[in-house]
């Protein structure tokens, strides 16, 4: 079929010439079909577009993303740490053994046993308030576990201070290394500098370290996690049961989880004992006879003690180190930043003064234990000043902060 072409010469067309034939929708439709086919062939020759992937591939990359199937559109797709992102980057977890799923299953099974064997009789014969209070504590436990396990612990953005000289171990001229301090530590892949010095004492120093893996100067009390391969702000520890780091952003949820988990265990023990005693009185039996008729409360007592011991021990330990203004990482590694002893009391460094809200470099912790604990567990996590961007740079440098993973 021949198609209309514009005239090559000027002047009005003559009557009966092809130029004088009017162009209708029917005559232009084949041209439109040919143009679309031509565009599809051209796109196919250039390669598949990122939006032309199958629905199953796009759904899989949105639900469980390990490696991006196309060029990264969000910062979490260009993230270089050892993390797995879920539901379009809204949740994250370490790329280790998923023990957090096993812990969640144990919690749900223990709650299911309580609701199946102890709660119905307690609701009908003692008081409905007892299972209702347990439900509230149990929901707090599950919610705190999910928030601590799948949320951002305070991961610091990468590739901010791209200095090859620092990564090689050489120090720029604008910095000076304190005498007696090894500048470059190849075992930890860090470079240490004495950055701040308090005027009250020349011995109380706060050190900055350059992480050669993340290419950033870590702020005070931040540390690099070898399991997650990330620098975490106020890094406390890496919890294998959560399969995530515990840092500034999820520390309170971790403490809330272990506290409510221990309370659930003790609540199950107390309710099961009350169940046995009330059933004995109601049926006019001895304790041995009531246990033969209903042996499940005895099993729940054992499981409750087993599930409450370890969480309550963790609660006591973290309340103790929180009262000292320390983290688990600082307590285990004996960090000199937090281990200056003055008159038998641990001195407060510059970073601890920020936690306590005090500028006294040697304020005793015994005078403000409650203030330190409240500041550590209840302090507001300030929002980041940098805007949360949607797309990454062509080099994959992460400019935004970790406020929302779905836009990180």
UniProtKB/Swiss-Prot annotation:
<comment type="similarity">
    <text>Belongs to the DHHC palmitoyltransferase family. ERF2/ZDHHC9 subfamily.</text>
</comment>
<feature type="region of interest" description="Disordered">
    <location>
        <begin position="1"/>
        <end position="55"/>
    </location>
</feature>
<feature type="transmembrane region" description="Helical">
    <location>
        <begin position="101"/>
        <end position="121"/>
    </location>
</feature>
<keyword id="KW-0472">Membrane</keyword>
<keyword id="KW-1133">Transmembrane helix</keyword>
<protein>
    <recommendedName>
        <fullName>Palmitoyltransferase ERF2</fullName>
        <ecNumber>2.3.1.225</ecNumber>
    </recommendedName>
</protein>
<keyword id="KW-0564">Palmitate</keyword>
<feature type="topological domain" description="Cytoplasmic">
    <location>
        <begin position="147"/>
        <end position="253"/>
    </location>
</feature>
<comment type="function">
    <text>The ERF2-ERF4 complex is a palmitoyltransferase specific for Ras proteins.</text>
</comment>
<keyword id="KW-0812">Transmembrane</keyword>
<keyword id="KW-0256">Endoplasmic reticulum</keyword>
<comment type="subunit">
    <text>Interacts with ERF4.</text>
</comment>
<feature type="topological domain" description="Lumenal">
    <location>
        <begin position="275"/>
        <end position="296"/>
    </location>
</feature>
<dbReference type="GO" id="GO:0019706">
    <property type="term" value="F:protein-cysteine S-palmitoyltransferase activity"/>
</dbReference>
<dbReference type="GO" id="GO:0005794">
    <property type="term" value="C:Golgi apparatus"/>
</dbReference>
<feature type="active site" description="S-palmitoyl cysteine intermediate">
    <location>
        <position position="239"/>
    </location>
</feature>
<feature type="transmembrane region" description="Helical">
    <location>
        <begin position="126"/>
        <end position="146"/>
    </location>
</feature>
<dbReference type="InterPro" id="IPR001594">
    <property type="entry name" value="Palmitoyltrfase_DHHC"/>
</dbReference>
<dbReference type="GO" id="GO:0005783">
    <property type="term" value="C:endoplasmic reticulum"/>
</dbReference>
<feature type="transmembrane region" description="Helical">
    <location>
        <begin position="297"/>
        <end position="317"/>
    </location>
</feature>
<feature type="transmembrane region" description="Helical">
    <location>
        <begin position="254"/>
        <end position="274"/>
    </location>
</feature>
<keyword id="KW-0449">Lipoprotein</keyword>
<dbReference type="GO" id="GO:0005789">
    <property type="term" value="C:endoplasmic reticulum membrane"/>
</dbReference>
<feature type="topological domain" description="Lumenal">
    <location>
        <begin position="122"/>
        <end position="125"/>
    </location>
</feature>
<keyword id="KW-0808">Transferase</keyword>
<feature type="domain" description="DHHC">
    <location>
        <begin position="209"/>
        <end position="259"/>
    </location>
</feature>
<dbReference type="Pfam" id="PF01529">
    <property type="entry name" value="DHHC"/>
</dbReference>
<dbReference type="InterPro" id="IPR039859">
    <property type="entry name" value="PFA4/ZDH16/20/ERF2-like"/>
</dbReference>
<feature type="topological domain" description="Cytoplasmic">
    <location>
        <begin position="1"/>
        <end position="100"/>
    </location>
</feature>
<dbReference type="GO" id="GO:0006612">
    <property type="term" value="P:protein targeting to membrane"/>
</dbReference>
<feature type="topological domain" description="Cytoplasmic">
    <location>
        <begin position="318"/>
        <end position="408"/>
    </location>
</feature>
<keyword id="KW-0012">Acyltransferase</keyword>
<feature type="compositionally biased region" description="Low complexity">
    <location>
        <begin position="1"/>
        <end position="14"/>
    </location>
</feature>
